[in-house]
From Swiss-Prot:
InterPro entries: GAF-like_dom_sf (IPR029016), HrcA (IPR002571), HrcA_C (IPR021153), WH-like_DNA-bd_sf (IPR036388), WH_DNA-bd_sf (IPR036390), WHTH_transcript_rep_HrcA_IDD (IPR023120). Pfam families: HrcA. SUPFAM superfamilies: GAF domain-like, Winged helix' DNA-binding domain. This is Heat-inducible transcription repressor HrcA. The keyword Repressor applies. The keyword Transcription applies. The gene is hrcA. GO terms for molecular function: DNA binding. It comes from Mesorhizobium japonicum (strain LMG 29417 / CECT 9101 / MAFF 303099). GO terms for biological process: negative regulation of DNA-templated transcription. Negative regulator of class I heat shock genes (grpE-dnaK-dnaJ and groELS operons). Prevents heat-shock induction of these operons. Belongs to the HrcA family. NCBIfam families: hrcA. It comes from the Bacteria.
Amino acid sequence: MTKAIDPGSQPLALQSLDMRSRDIFRRIVDSYLRDGEPVGSRSLSRILPSSLSPATIRNVMSDLEHLGLIYAPHISAGRLPTQAGLRFFVDAFMELGDLSDEERRTIEAQVRASGSGATLEHMLTEASQMLSGMSRGAGLVLAAKNEVALKHIEFIQLEPTKALAVLVSQNGDVENRVVELPAGITVSQLHEASNFLNAHIRGRTLAEARTEIARIKEETRAALDTLSQDLVEKGLAVWAGAESGLPARLIVRGRANLLENVTAQADIELLRHLFEDMETQDGLIQLLDLAEQGSGVRIFIGSENKLFSLSGSSLVVAPYRDKDARVVGALGVIGPTRLNYARIVPMVDYTAQLISRMLR
């Protein structure tokens, strides 16, 4: 069992690595990210300076293993980076690439084309598909449901003092809430309140609808009687109260990419866990919370990502924001721990910035 590096001791571990150890460690990680296979001292000796013998390299590898940076998956096998080693590499050694002009144009053209006259969900779905195609991992987008544009609201009387508020979004989702009715309200007044709301909420998110109704408060008083006004306020209030509990929508594209080059039964089992995690809504809000905690792209390796921890996958994720700079969703790439982090980080970052600009 390999000892993992305690996060607080990483600076000390970094200081203890001389240039030769750093070079060997970097070559091991580079080889793993490229091929996914263990690398041995003999293979390393062929690509390192000729002054380093296999025996010298083995001694350095032993030190790296003692630090918890690498491990041997089998007896007499080469070495692979541990999860802690990958985190150490990402934090201390990784040099981020930059998107080419062609890649930027491709991302911008695809996202903007999908957003032109289309629903927000369609644009986010296309962004997920695009991230999958460019990363060879699975692209994912998490959108808070309360940010979907609204289409229609209707009040259906259940009892003299209760009604069902039915909210329909432009993507076809339907949500129901029971609201308390003001004493003495009639069916005609229910229709009045519904018609007034529909005239002002269509195409707006729930947050925007609340802001708009507050803005036209005087108009509301002039157009509606007291009981209908009360119902309008209660109808929006019940949705506002449930807003934080609305489930998030996870859009995933490119699952098939994760099946490429998978042969070991253990890897298949890990993928099974990952697919199960992506099918459940439980805990998806954690993903949004993780993205919200940072101002830009965040990288979660293996069990650092609690949502998909059983699958041993890595996640590169960034938040996107609305016109008020509020985090309203997250997007990214999930895949094996040997993701091409240096290329995927700027890709995710640029896509998140682009979608944020389109939501303003």
